[in-house]
Curated annotation (Swiss-Prot):
Residues 440-461 are annotated as: Homomultimerization. This is Nucleoprotein. The keyword Ribonucleoprotein applies. It is found in: Virion; Host cytoplasm. The gene is N.
């Protein structure tokens, strides 16, 4: 019987291994598109010329009249400018089954009077039409940088910041767009500027060189459509992480940005390991969790087999990345999320209300996480030399911390709080009140929020967070009563003022009450 159980335990991992292993059949190459990439030749030595070419690449990448593959090629050309040998960079990181990069050199000929003396060429021939297409007049539909209203002026930027800083600022921002385009495409602009703030504070990106919102959206649209560009950037990260130690400042900044996309799309998998397995609670011995534990073990083996590219399997669209979805191990994931919402308050905003959520296991996870005995790791008792007295005191403290809190967290997706209040200053400090304070407004939760004719005062998400930090449970209920009382008084004043009109100037009360209810004010 033991042998039979062992066979079942290893079936999942062996099955996954056999599916993903190469069968040794004939290799039939697929169709590949050709992408033109432009690199600087040895005759381009002036910093002003280099920065002009960089901003030209950026402008072409935003041209909506061009195909996305062409626009992606200009972004590749821009990224390659960070290296002394762009050809070697593309040879090392640009091997891709979807595209074939064709490299053209840009040279500077002082005798040329048109196209600013630039000429596009290869070893054998020159390309006049391509040169005119690349360096000819081009109308920018929007400024590239926030510090400019018209086309980029390389001389001005170069004089202020210098070439390495300008090029580094541009390339770092392209990498930040990659991060946000992959992880939160719906909020690309907001996410980009939030992530950029750290680089602005340390001086990596100067204010005049910050991308405009239109530039961010344009680059993001190209990255979402050109998987070959994303693959090139990921391979760049892998190379920097594994093959080199003498990184430039720009490359170190790229590594910092790249850390934000490590394990992107694998949050459920990582959280299941962290809260479901590594906590090592007794619930893991349940028989209905065993299939999911075996599945998770198989996924861990698959993840480790990917080597340095493992953190990027979702970004690279590796065929196995769908196996890591929590729907493939729902019971264990549900249990882990129950533990998580108790142990980590930030996880209470994590989206747990999914169709495959096992409610019983979700509640079980919360129950064992709240249990004082389960919080003590027996594996560390001997190693740390914990005495029986110390363990008893620890159990006592844990029981006191969790005592009286028998409520369970419901599955939720979280959300910001923004409550429209009347145009009045509300003092949030607790104050004494009497039963008479509550007279004049009903106890019904739907009636206790007064309807007003204006909403000029808001509690925003930032204010709500500050309120949560500065108040305790008793303060919250007191604040709720006082806000309701103030609004009730204002409602009574409005009713007196508009008695002859019979209505409050056409205000949609239902909509306002619904907004307050949606913001959760009734449950403070």
């Amino acid at each position: 019987m033991a042998g039979l159980l062992s066979t079942f335990d290893t079936f999942s991992s062996r099955r996954s291994e056999s599916i993903n292993k190469s069968g040794g059949g004939a290799v039939i190459p697929g169709q590949r598109s050709t992408v033109s990439v432009f690199v600087l030749g040895p005759s381009v030595t002036d910093d002003a010329d280099k920065l002009f070419i960089a901003t030209t690449f950026l402008a072409h990448s935003l041209d909506t009249d061009k195909q996305h593959s062409q626009r992606g090629g200009f972004l590749v050309s821009l990224l390659a400018m960070a290296y002394s040998s762009p050809e070697l960079y593309l040879t090392t990181n640009g091997v891709n089954a979807d595209v074939k990069y064709v490299i053209y050199n840009i040279e500077k000929d002082p005798k040329r009077t048109k196209t600013d003396g630039f000429i596009v060429k290869t070893r054998d021939m020159e390309y006049e039409r391509t040169t005119e297409w690349l360096f000819g007049p081009m109308v920018n539909k929007s400024p590239l940088f926030q510090g400019q209203r018209d086309a980029a002026d390389p001389d001005t930027l170069l004089q202020i910041y210098g070439y390495p800083a300008c090029l580094g600022a541009i390339i770092v921002q392209v990498w930040i767009v990659l991060v946000k385009a992959i992880t939160s495409s719906a909020g690309l602009r907001k996410g980009f500027f939030n992530r950029l703030e750290a680089f602005r504070q340390d001086g990596t990106v100067k204010g005049a060189l910050v991308f405009t919102g239109e530039t961010v959206e344009g680059i993001g649209s190209v990255m979402r459509s050109q998987q070959s560009l994303v693959s090139l950037m990921v391979e760049t990260l892998v190379t920097m992480n594994t093959a080199r130690s003498d990184l430039t400042t720009l490359e170190k900044n790229i590594q910092i940005v790249g850390n934000y996309i490590r394990d992107a799309g694998l949050a459920s998998f990582m959280n299941t390991i962290k809260y479901g397995v590594e906590t090592k609670m007794a619930a893991l011995t349940l028989s209905n969790l065993r299939p999911d534990i075996n599945k998770l073990r198989s996924l861990i083996d698959t993840y480790l087999s990917k080597g340095p590219r493992a953190p990027f399997i979702c970004i690279l669209k590796d065929p196995v990345h769908g196996e890591f979805a929590p729907g493939n191990y729902p019971a264990l994931w549900s249990y882990a999320m129950g533990v998580a919402v108790v142990q980590n308050k930030a996880m209470q905003q994590y989206v747990t209300g999914r169709t495959y959520l096992d409610m019983e296991m979700f509640l079980l996870g919360q129950a064992v996480a709240k249990d004082a005995e389960s919080k003590i790791s027996s594996a560390l008792e001997d190693e740390l030399g914990v005495t029986d007295t110390a363990k008893e005191r620890l159990r006592h403290h844990l029981a006191n911390l969790s005592g009286g809190d028998g409520a369970y967290h419901k599955p939720t997706g979280g959300g910001a709080i923004e409550v429209a209040l009347d145009n009045a200053d509300i003092d949030l400090e607790p104050e004494a009140h009497t039963d008479q304070d509550a007279r004049g407004w009903g106890g019904d939760s739907g009636d206790r929020w007064a309807r007003s004719t204006s909403s000029g005062h808001f509690i925003t998400l930032h204010g709500a967070e500050r309120l949560e930090e500065e108040t305790n449970d008793e303060d919250v209920s007191d604040i709720e009563r006082r806000i309701a009382r103030r609004l009730a008084e204002r409602r009574q004043e409005d009713a007196t003022t508009h008695e002859d009109e019979g209505r409050n100037n056409g205000v949609d009360h239902d909509e306002e009450d619904d907004a307050a209810a949606a913001a959760g004010m009734g449950g403070i």
